[in-house]
Amino acid sequence: MALTRRNLISATILGAAAVAAPMAQAKQKTPLKPMKVSPKRRVLIQSSSRYHNSGYLDFAGDQYEKLFGKEKYEILFIPYAKVAGTYDAYEKQVQDAFKPYGHKIVSIHRFKDPQKAVREAKAIAVGGGNTWALVTRMYEAGIIDLIRERVNAGVPYCGWRQRRLPDVAHH
């Protein structure tokens, strides 16, 4: 499958780590391993970061509690979809959103070795924004397969789109 913008659109909805590897295969020198799905997966994919007039990621509190349980995690945040602003600012926004749940957010850009960061992550969150930038940067960092392996091993994974869901009034 060609690495094109059209093929990457589904990555936002289905989770970049789950679908990006086959798309990146066109540029990879060796074939990727077939995707194996594990029943251990703990995944939450949100179609938006906001709903109606809610704050950033506010409306998903119940889902986060189901995903993470009572355990408090240090969550590895992947901000690579951010194209306007800084990774630091994006990390802070996500830290503030997860603070009420007791989780600590640390962005992958703070690590010298992003692959090691993914291998050692206890939980992973992928922020929304520009899907092309996200998948390209994940591919360049060599973390797509690693994220899939970690998710299939049962590491909690969440991701979201950047935009707000429309508020459709029923009359």
Language-model regions, residue ranges each:
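C-terminal segment of N-terminal export signals and the immediately downstream linker at the start
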Residues: M23-R42
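Glycine-rich phosphate/diphosphate-binding loops that line cofactor/substrate pockets in enzymes
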Residues: V37-S38, G61-Y73, V118
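Short polar catalytic/cofactor-binding loops
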Residues: S48-H52
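Portal/gating segments that form or line small-molecule/metal binding sites
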Residues: K82-G128, W132-L134, Y139
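Class I SAM-dependent methyltransferase SAM-binding "motif I" and its flanking Rossmann-like core
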Residues: V135-R137, A141-H171
